[in-house]
Amino acid sequence: MKKLLCILCSLLIVLFAATSFAAAGEKRVVLGIDRIDEPFAKQLLAGKRLGLFTNQSGVDSKLRSSTELLQKSYNLTALFVPEHGLFGAVAAGETFESHTYKDIPVHSLYGEDRRPTAKMLDEIDTMVVDIQDVGIRHYTYFSSLAYIMEECAKAKKQVVVLDRPNPLGGAMQGPVLKPEYKTFIGLYELPLRHGLTIGEFASYINATQHIGWGVGGGGVGGGGGGGGG
């Protein structure tokens, strides 16, 4: 038995983590990346040039790299990488240059460019997102995702978020960011502990910042949430 919830927008599609039940009756989380071979995902991704926004946190429930999984199953043509680099080895606040990994272009989004350029986006048809947030506002991965969504909207590129649970759960706590203090470290008026998964954040800013071209919804059963389903 599995619960499935997908939020659909003309720009944005979120493949939420789901809850499944093992033979012993125990619940376990199925990550968005765990579902890339399902028919719904294949309809979204097959036959398209894929970009992937990720780093070392992009792994499935068996700790297999999302980069390698997408490269194996689909046409992965470019990687887009936030602060700290592809493997988390770059110090906080330190910029890094674009490079290649296993013959795939790796575009730095924490160097000369903080946003994907039109030239970068020319390499892809769809941007896939699989990255782990930590559940607090002052973390630059959310900002990089927001910039990706804005530039993909301009270029009319679809964004598919492979969701994963918020490690701090779904509760919100702490002061809300004041507009006059917005920076790349905190772009939106969210509480310090925001309670959102990265997919929920993407859906939220797509609606509130009017990034996409209208919002619709669909799915079967329940799921999502700060706990992943």
Segments (PLM) and residue ranges:
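Glycine-rich oxoanion-binding loops at beta->alpha junctions
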Residues: 92-124, 136
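Glycine-rich, charge-decorated loop segments at or immediately adjacent to ligand/cofactor-binding or catalytic sites
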Residues: 88-93, 160-182
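A short helix->loop->beta-strand "cap" motif at the edges of active sites that frequently abuts
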Residues: 74-75, 152-158
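Conserved anion/nucleotide-ligand pocket segment
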Residues: 182-222, 227-229
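Bacterial N-terminal signal peptides
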Residues: 7-18
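N-terminal phosphate-binding or glycine-rich loops at protein starts, especially the Walker A/P-loop
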Residues: 28-74
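Short internal beta-strands
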Residues: 77-85
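Glycine/threonine-rich flexible loop motifs
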Residues: 133-145
